[in-house]
């Protein structure tokens, strides 16, 4: 009887280890993106202070801010900034600039962002609040990056 309990525990631990390694593997991509943004885009364009101010002002995690920044950079000049393709990260800019778009498309875009940046539900809600309430901060990001057009929705 004791033997079977031990065996079950060992099996359970193996499954946990396997799940952990899969999760690490999934998160490695977003970590790589974040590091690349931090080391290239932010330093080159002096955006570190802007990211810090967004973080302190809106109480969101770095991951949300880098996610939003990444979306804006992809929208402005994908060829100029990206040495690799991140086409699957771009739907959010439609939702930011065209709020009249259908609800299902908006929801799909948000779920895509949540999935790509491994955001929790709470972080996703904060991201939406950041987009809706602090549009001017996003505008500052666009202007600081230099380029792109932004139309204030009516």
Curated annotation (Swiss-Prot):
Subcellular localization(s) per the UniProt record: Mitochondrion
Keywords in alphabetical order: Mitochondrion
GO cellular component: mitochondrion
Origin: domain of life: Eukaryota
Main location: mitochondrion
Protein name: Uncharacterized mitochondrial protein ORF154
Lineage of producing organism: Eukaryota, Viridiplantae, Streptophyta, Embryophyta, Tracheophyta
